[in-house]
A protein has these predicted regions:
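Accessory, non-ATPase domains that flank or precede helicase/AAA+ motor cores in DNA-metabolism machines
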Residues: 1-195, 200, 205-219
């Protein structure tokens, strides 16, 4: 074939086809309305981010307080700055409905990885992230290794979950790894939980982390 190409008899076009776990849904860009408590948290985060403050924050909110909606507002702000975002969710909670909520907000900017994907599928998603084809990667602790060139935020939902600890070699804790990764990339970290780990809560109470509270359930 190469001689035919060199003689101009035929032409070859190369198109990359990714093994993409397609997310289907009824469109996206649904409107998310924040209540005053959620708004206060999101606005404080955005103001500090705009000031160049990169830190770890603990979003301590009761079940049903709307932490996910706050994450989305934070993510939207970081994406508007041309940065990229990793969202860690425990594998057991990484359901279709959970991912769909993000997809409806950010559309095809969102990709997902999980343990059920083949090595090739995971490779494709990492390559898309590196090229900038996706800007929000959702997954379990392994999503931390997404090669985003402009990482701006790491969200760890249900940060108290033991699933964030890897007991196999290489051993690591997703929270500690995320903080180091954020430091290297000039990014922020947001930890979320209704029952935060003792380590995270202690660091928040002693000023090592910024502490946000959502004390009441969000009204539907």
């Amino acid at each position: 074939m190469k001689p035919l190409v060199e003689k101009g008899i035929i032409s070859v076009e190369v198109e990359t086809m990714y093994r993409n776990p397609e997310i289907s849904g009824n469109g996206y860009k649904t409107v998310v309305s924040l209540n005053p408590a959620q708004t206060a948290v999101a606005e404080d985060f955005k103001n500090r981010y705009d000031q160049g403050i990169r830190e770890t924050s603990l979003l301590y909110g009761v079940t049903g307080s709307g932490k996910t909606e706050v994450y989305m507002e934070m993510i939207r702000h970081v994406l508007a700055k041309g940065r990229q975002v990793i969202v860690l969710i425990p594998e057991i909670a990484l359901t279709y409905q959970t991912v769909l909520r993000f997809y409806r907000q950010f559309g095809r900017q969102v990709s997902v990885i999980n343990s059920r994907m083949s090595a090739g599928e995971r490779y494709d998603q990492f390559e898309r992230a590196e090229k900038g084809d996706v800007t929000v990667m959702i997954g379990p602790r392994s999503a931390l290794f997404t090669p985003f060139p402009k990482l701006g935020l790491i969200v760890i939902d249900e940060e108290h979950e033991s699933a964030y600890k890897s007991e196999l070699s290489p051993r690591y804790h997703a929270r500690e790894t995320a903080e180091e990764l954020a430091r290297m990339n000039g990014a922020s970290v947001v930890l979320g939980s209704a029952t935060p780990s003792l380590e995270a809560y202690t660091r928040a109470k002693t000023g090592q982390y910024r502490l946000y509270r959502l004390a009441e359930r969000a009204k539907k």
